Amino acid sequence: RTHVNSPAIVIWSLGNEAGPGDNFVAAYQAIKDYDGSRPVQYERNNNIVDMGSNQYPSVAWVQHVATGKANVKYPYHISEYADSMGNAAGNLIDYWTAMESTNYFCGAAIWDWVDQAIDTYTPDGYKYFGYGGDHGDWPNDGMFCMNGIMLPDLSPKPQYFEVKKVYQNAGITLTENG
């Protein structure tokens, strides 16, 4: 019960991309027995949880769900979007314009916040962010650990500034009257 009183925990999750099955029904019930005050989400099976969720929907789909007339469970949460591999996350404003137009959405979670790598050094002392096969092993199938909006040392990447602007607390719109 370490984190049950944390104000930072607003939703419990059954996991990420782990498939369906009876174990998730049992896990949902165990979480509700443990803490019935917070909703539970799981993007692989919205039938067994308290709120709707999915990953990487299109902007058009989000706009439709924002009407409150979609065949989904509300409130709705995008559990994974804006994968920031390379130069990505440029259409966040389109997602958030739709989500903020309604009370049917309760947010979305960026994948990933920070690149997953560690300080690594060449034999001559040059420091770089190392991951996966950089350490002599090959347990991975690609560069799926350097897709955050922050570098491993927490310095911002270009995507960070897009997110900061879109997530700002105040919205300003120019009207015809200036």
Where are these regions (language model features)?
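Surface beta-strand/loop "capping" patches
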Residues: 154-178
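Substrate-binding/catalytic cleft of secreted carbohydrate-active enzymes
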Residues: 1-149
